[in-house]
Amino acid sequence: MATGKIQTKFGDIEIEFFADAAPKTVENFVKLSKSGFYDGLAFHRIVPGFVIQGGDPNTKSAANRSKWGTGGPGWTVKAEFNKNKHSRGALSMARSQDPNSAGSQFFIVLKDSNFLDGQYTVFGRVTAGMDAVDKIAALKCDSADAPVDADQARMVKVTAS
């Protein structure tokens, strides 16, 4: 079973990946994690009662704040919609309007959001550390849903195997 961990200042978020349901998506996330791509990035979109979103390389610097939410790894992964639900703790790929545009950005669901089912690729779930997720979700944000103090929302290190 493939697993991962997102280290944050609020504690570790432990993840179980759904490699059978979304093999290419899991492979992509593991590859990015092993390369250090996610280390130091911020959860740049925080919508209380909905999701926290991260994985944009533009969030390494506050100077790029206007570009937060637009970055990726330079490639995309085809959608792998599956039977897994967008329930609390689900790990899913963020994307643009094109279903096949996911790259590195992902989100963790804070509250059951079944309206996302079949439209976004669920590729894992949080098995421990939802308390850390909830603390990130409670951070003060600006009008663009970005954390006012991005250092509070940083992913210190992301590992996966």
Named regions from a protein language model:
Residues 1-161:
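Cyclophilin-like peptidyl-prolyl cis-trans isomerases
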